[in-house]
Amino acid sequence: MSEVTTAEFNEEGKYLRKIRSFVLREGRLTKGQAQAIESQWPTMGLDYSPTPLVLSDVFGREADTVLEIGFGMGASLVQMAKDAPEQNFIGIEVHKPGVGSCLSDAAIAGVTNLRVYHHDAMEVLEHAIADGSLARVQLFFPDPWHKKRHHKRRIVQAEFAELIRRKLKIGGVFHMATDWEEYSEHMLEVMQAAPGYQNQSSDGTVVPRPDHRPLTKFEARGHRLGHGVWDLMFERIA
């Protein structure tokens, strides 16, 4: 297991170490995952380029676009794409087995409204997604980095909230979910302080799981054991 970093330099040429919110755990691809990448990447894969996508060209139509950061094995993302054929979906995942699994499931489901990146989400968001182009950004069950000394690695920080705000349309929604209560409190604190957002919760805290987010097997098992999951939804208003 190795931490993923990118070499960056400031204007004076000083090396800057960029902290990542993930660690790369590259398992072996199964035969099915490898075959799915080979067969489906030409139609569903997006090769990273530091120029903004023209979404109407990518999908061949004008439609609301939902982007998910870190889709894991992709089962819930494929289900969402299948359930909402009128919307476009983009998933970003750094772990190759997850990409292969997602593409395999998407092919079996017959979805045509899903595209996938195998790349660092921050670089994709910063360079490949146009400002004001997304209807929803999803961040489900990110690494909580529960040790206090690792809190700086949490992806939900003030700068990240501003980056997401820029990428959303006015009226677009940033939807987060976590099964770590303390992280939900951190998310809420960051987002309440972030300019240009309005909490969609009626009481200013969390929201019930919306219908568009499928209940995962892991989550269903957690419910049976009395474990909580916290959803937060913030709308871009400025």
From Swiss-Prot:
Pathway: tRNA modification; N(7)-methylguanine-tRNA biosynthesis
rRNA-binding in keyword set: no
Residues the record lists as binding substrate: K147, D179, T216, K217, F218, E219
Alphabetical list of Gene3D superfamilies matching this protein: Vaccinia Virus protein VP39 (3.40.50.150)
Alphabetized UniProt keyword annotations: Methyltransferase, S-adenosyl-L-methionine, Transferase, tRNA processing
Catalytic activity: guanosine(46) in tRNA + S-adenosyl-L-methionine = N(7)-methylguanosine(46) in tRNA + S-adenosyl-L-homocysteine
EC number: 2.1.1.33
UniProt GO MF annotations: tRNA (guanine(46)-N7)-methyltransferase activity
Binding site for S-adenosyl-L-methionine: E68, E93, D120, D143
Signal sequence coordinates: none
Recorded GO CC terms: tRNA methyltransferase complex
Active site feature: D143
Superkingdom, taxonomy of origin: Bacteria
Pfam family of the protein (one): Methyltransf_4
NCBIfam families registered for this protein in UniProt: tRNA (guanosine(46)-N7)-methyltransferase TrmB (TIGR00091)
Protein purpose: Catalyzes the formation of N(7)-methylguanine at position 46 (m7G46) in tRNA.
Record-stated family: Belongs to the class I-like SAM-binding methyltransferase superfamily. TrmB family.
Database matches in PANTHER family: 3-DEOXY-D-MANNO-OCTULOSONIC-ACID TRANSFERASE/TRNA GUANINE-N 7 - -METHYLTRANSFERASE, PENTACOTRIPEPTIDE-REPEAT REGION OF PRORP DOMAIN-CONTAINING PROTEIN
Protein known as: tRNA (guanine-N(7)-)-methyltransferase
